[in-house]
Design a protein with these regions (language model features):
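Active-site mouth loops of central-metabolism enzymes
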Residues: 5-19, 92-96, 124-125
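Gly/lys/ser-thr-rich phosphate-binding loops in alpha/beta enzymes
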Residues: 7, 12-14, 22, 85-87, ...
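Conserved, mostly hydrophobic/aromatic
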Residues: 6, 26, 114
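Hydrophobic residues within beta-strands of alpha/beta enzymes
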Residues: 34-36, 114
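Histidine-centered catalytic micro-motifs
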Residues: 2-12, 36-41
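Extended substrate/RNA-proximal surfaces in nucleic-acid metabolism proteins
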Residues: 44-125
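Short, acidic/polar
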Residues: 15-25, 97-105
Length: 125
């Protein structure tokens, strides 16, 4: 089975394509299992004003709202393309101390998988 479990869309700061575009490209390339796993720091754009609200303030609410919006969008596409390609919903987490910190309570269990980046770097947390 041909598969790709590391792809990014416009939800990531390093991707520019719509999710539909990369799914269509995967189908055209013969991929049968396709994972979309955008960077959590891209899905959730950091706004400096959130810092003043603390981790349990409005910024935390935005984390939840944006992650659920991303999850729901990919979920709709999973249904749309069922029978043509199997789509997994992932999220990519950064372990570097200077990255946008994740709230301690953050629940990502509803994703199919998570990729952890920079885990081999000395300064990784």
């Amino acid at each position: 089975m041909l598969q790709d479990l590391h792809s990014h869309t416009y939800y990531s700061y390093c991707g520019g394509d719509r999710p539909e575009e990369i799914i269509e490209a995967a189908i055209a390339g013969g991929i049968e299992l396709f994972g979309i796993n955008d960077h959590v720091n891209g899905v959730i754009t950091h706004v400096p004003e959130w810092d003043a609200l603390g981790k349990d303030g409005w910024g935390s609410w935005v984390y939840d709202r944006m992650l659920h919006r991303y999850h729901d969008h990919i979920g709709l596409l999973r249904e749309k393309y069922a029978g043509r390609i199997k789509i997994l919903q992932g999220i990519e987490l950064c372990t570097l101390p200077y990255a946008l910190p994740l709230p301690e309570y953050l629940d990502i269990s509803y994703f199919d998988y998570a990729l952890i980046e920079h885990i081999d770097m000395k300064e990784s947390i």
